[in-house]
Swiss-Prot record:
This is Arsenite resistance protein ArsB. It is a multi-pass membrane protein. It comes from Bacillus subtilis (strain 168). Pfam families: SBF (PF01758). GO terms for molecular function: antimonite transmembrane transporter activity; antiporter activity; arsenite transmembrane transporter activity. Its main location: membrane. Belongs to the arsenical resistance-3 (ACR3) (TC 2.A.59) family. The keyword Membrane applies. It is found in: Cell membrane. One of its GO terms (biological process) is arsenite transport. The chain crosses the membrane at residues 13-33, 41-61, 82-102, 106-126, 140-160, 184-204, 216-236, 253-273, 285-307, 318-338. Deletion of the arsB gene results in both an aresenite- and arsenate-sensitive phenotype in the absence of IPTG.
Length: 346
């Protein structure tokens, strides 16, 4: 069985350490915070914007866009994946946000953003560890990357502004426009998306696919973690005013996230098995639906609502919960393989 890299395996610990470092910097060196506040254009923090774009670039440079045609070969599986990723996932997270955070509309938004952002990076890792279908996973990642580029802003507007109004949840309504979200999506997803596609096209053509995937990609992969931790340090250095309530708030946000990741995985796995997909495709569907693009959720939450917002804070909790849960679910998937698929699983 493949092993998770040292950096990825302890990602939750690195995030906690980054939070602590950010909080410490904010209290011990207030001049550090003052310096960060000066590096802004309007409401946009320049260091944070750079960190967020860099965080998104390696995952999008890894995407095998040429594999997207694979997802159209089995329409039944494609429809199931679309339903799981773009109907069940966002709706489930919306419901959980309402149930667990009715008095915290900004935290609700952070959760909703996580539910809307379909995974395009770590899902490849979980899929490999659980012996999923590598090429099909690559196709779904490519498909979801393009789908998010086109429709994320529409989804965000519907789930954050329109549906709460329909349900009469006036206290939870946050008025945003599709243009606001689209602007952040373009900056934090569009720019690295274009850069990733161009990078892949040029280097594969000049140096070859094997060099690109075995030499170039491993070299740029750590950028995502470094940029993520940098982003968290900056965010938490500016949040000294909420430190006292931080532990309780982390737990309140973490509980619905835990329920979401577990439910999405199990529901998606058994739906895949129900339609007759083999183990490799079934587990790929389950991890694609069950994991999320927390980098995009953080970026959009910061871009639209600001670095000090509850939405940005809630989005940061996403990877804290997701990583250890997904590591556990990899073991569950391999147990399901032995129990339900046997020797004919691949």
């Amino acid at each position: 069985m493949k092993r998770l890299s040292f950096l990825d395996r302890y990602l939750t610990i690195w995030i906690f350490l980054a939070m602590a470092l950010g909080i410490g910097l904010g209290f011990i060196f207030p001049s550090f915070v003052g310096g960060l506040n000066k590096l802004q254009v309007g409401t946009t923090s320049i260091p944070l914007a750079i960190g967020l774009v860099l965080m998104m670039y390696p995952p999008l440079a890894k995407v095998r866009y040429e594999e997207i045609g694979r997802v159209f070969k089995d329409i039944k599986v494609l429809i199931l994946s679309l339903v799981q990723n773009w109907i069940i996932g966002p709706t489930l997270m919306f419901i959980l946000a309402i149930i667990f955070l009715p008095d915290k509309p900004e935290y609700m938004i952070g959760l909703i953003m996580i539910g809307l952002a379909r995974c395009i990076a770590m899902v490849i890792v979980w899929n490999d560890l659980s012996k999923g279908d590598t090429e099909y996973a690559a196709g779904l990642v490519a498909f979801n990357s393009i789908f998010q580029m086109l429709f994320f802003s529409v989804y965000a507007y519907i789930f954050v502004t329109v549906i709460p109004q329909w349900l009469g949840m006036e206290g939870a309504v946050v008025n945003i426009t599709m243009a606001e979200v689209a602007k952040s999506v373009f900056i934090y997803l569009g720019v690295p998306f274009i850069a990733g596609m161009v990078t892949r096209y040029i280097f594969v053509k000049v140096k070859g696919k094997e060099w690109y995937e075995k030499v170039f990609i491993p070299k740029i992969s750590p950028i995502t973690l470094i940029a993520l931790l940098f982003t968290i340090i900056v965010m938490f250095s500016l949040k000294g005013d909420v430190i006292v309530s931080l532990p309780l708030d982390v737990v309140r946000v973490a509980i619905p996230l835990l329920i979401y990741f577990v439910l999405m995985f199990f529901v998606s796995f058994f739906l895949g098995k129900k339609i007759g997909a083999n183990y490799a495709v079934t587990t790929t569907l389950a991890f694609t639906a069950g994991s999320n693009n927390f980098e995009l959720a953080i970026a959009v939450a910061v871009g639209v609502f600001g670095i000090h917002s509850g939405a940005a804070f809630a989005a940061v909790i996403g990877p804290l919960v997701e990583v250890p849960v997904m590591i556990a679910l990899v073991k569950v998937a391999l147990w399901f393989q032995r129990k339900y698929f046997g020797s004919h699983s691949m």
